[in-house]
């Protein structure tokens, strides 16, 4: 299965390595580094690379490349899923998954990797079990361990390992019983010059924070579950109930976890929450051009569009730009030719506008194509797909928990062609 694991930072340097079967030289990561340089961005590299003697399976999370080295063919998705589990476990343990946090807790990281893989095969990947095996770091525990010479390794067998519900331990108790759900939707879209939608889809996730005493059995229902495509669930979800009734029935893990992810690819179900009016043109003699952009809300159900950022890669012949912003701040880098307009939030009735002159390099031909607008935004308390949580029912326990749902819509790869 997995022979070695390497963690690389943004500069391509290996700052952590772990070997299970045989020691593989870190020089094997040079193949991945070369592929990253060719691709421009680490996210654009193919997840599986073949080298003369190994296969490299990698994923990029939190600015870190997680690289698994294997020698025989195995299902790539199996390895990729394990790498994501490693990243999520480090995030859960240390609050962030960064080079600094990993180096500060390097002993715990090695203890976790030792438990998560047994001779290269996944063994314990559930956060609930790992936290019983390896105690999460705290300031007090670190001080006690340094004085007594003890470690974070637990001295008892995890209770969840022996049950048919490995993601939840027995005897869980909370003073305040609460269940919160975050519905986050990311919209990817391409809008053409006329404002028509060329492509649009939604990637959504439902993250849960469950702190309930005992062994509760939860049922989460939706008002319109039929709009969801390509769903994937946490192992706790009873898939047959979803297939027959379109409800989520599950005994939850303790704490934070991703309950499900889903996809909406029907364009008539994807409401575009912003519109853009644009007028970008260049004179035929190639001396100057005119730039005029206005952004406004559309189909936002009265919610405020926040954190709006417009990024435009201008043509190479652009020398500088003389612009005026009715709202927000803008910067133009004459070296990279990147214009960034930070709008913030749209405060009606006035719409944010950016307009002015474009100065081109003398003697150069008129640009053949207009630039594309890359737009980022965020809308609180709105699921752009129309997904709504109906109710949450609890069985098996007698107390009444606090319940809450939060919705967020944000832009993914949102482009407007001019």
UniProtKB/Swiss-Prot annotation:
Annotated PROSITE patterns: CLAT_ADAPTOR_M_1, CLAT_ADAPTOR_M_2, MHD
Organism name: Diplobatis ommata (Ocellated electric ray)
Signal peptide location: none
Domain MHD: 176-417
UniProtKB keywords: Cytoplasmic vesicle, Golgi apparatus, Membrane, Phosphoprotein, Protein transport, Transport
Family that this chain belongs to: Belongs to the adaptor complexes medium subunit family.
PANTHER family associated with the record: AP COMPLEX SUBUNIT MU
The protein, known as: AP-1 complex subunit mu
């Amino acid at each position: 299965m997995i022979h070695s694991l390497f963690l690389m930072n943004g500069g391509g340097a290996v700052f952590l390595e772990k070997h299970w079967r045989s020691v593989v030289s870190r020089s094997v990561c040079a193949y991945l580094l070369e592929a990253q340089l060719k691709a421009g961005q680490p996210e654009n590299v193919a997840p599986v690379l073949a080298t003369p003697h190994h296969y490299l399976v990698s994923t990029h999370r939190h600015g870190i490349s997680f690289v698994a080295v294997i020698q025989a063919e195995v299902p790539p998705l199996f390895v990729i899923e394990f790498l994501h589990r490693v990243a999520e476990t480090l995030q859960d343990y240390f609050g962030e998954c960064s080079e600094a946090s990993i180096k500060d807790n390097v002993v715990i990281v090695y203890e976790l990797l030792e438990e998560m893989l047994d001779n290269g095969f996944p063994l314990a990947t559930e956060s609930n079990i790992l936290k019983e095996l390896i105690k999460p770091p705290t300031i007090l525990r670190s001080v006690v361990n340094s004085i007594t010479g003890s470690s974070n390794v637990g001295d008892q067998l995890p209770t969840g390992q022996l049950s048919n519900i490995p993601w939840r331990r027995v005897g869980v108790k909370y003073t305040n019983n609460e269940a919160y759900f975050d519905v986050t939707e990311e919209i990817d879209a391409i809008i053409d010059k006329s404002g028509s939608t060329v492509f649009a889809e939604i990637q959504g996730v439902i993250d849960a924070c469950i702190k309930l005493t005992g062994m509760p059995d939860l049922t989460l229902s939706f008002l319109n579950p039929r709009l969801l495509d390509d769903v994937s669930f946490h192992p706790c979800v009873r898939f047959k109930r979803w297939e027959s009734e379109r409800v989520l029935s599950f005994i939850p893990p303790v704490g934070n976890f991703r309950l499900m992810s889903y996809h909406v690819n029907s364009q008539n179900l994807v409401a575009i929450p912003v519109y853009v009016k644009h007028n970008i043109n260049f004179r035929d003699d190639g001396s100057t051009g005119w730039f005029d952009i206005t952004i406004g809300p559309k189909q936002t159900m009265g919610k405020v569009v926040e954190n709006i950022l417009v990024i435009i890669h201008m043509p190479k012949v652009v020398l500088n730009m003389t612009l005026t912003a009715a709202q927000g701040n803008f910067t133009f880098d004459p070296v990279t030719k990147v214009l960034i307009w930070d709008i913030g939030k749209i405060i009606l009735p006035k719409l944010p506008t950016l307009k002015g002159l474009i100065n081109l390099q003398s003697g150069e031909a008129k640009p053949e194509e207009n630039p594309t607008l890359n737009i980022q935004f965020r809308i609180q308390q709105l699921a752009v797909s129309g997904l709504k949580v109906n109710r949450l029912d609890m069985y098996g326990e007698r107390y009444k928990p606090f319940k809450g749902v939060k919705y967020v819509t944000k832009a993914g790869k949102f482009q407007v062609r001019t």
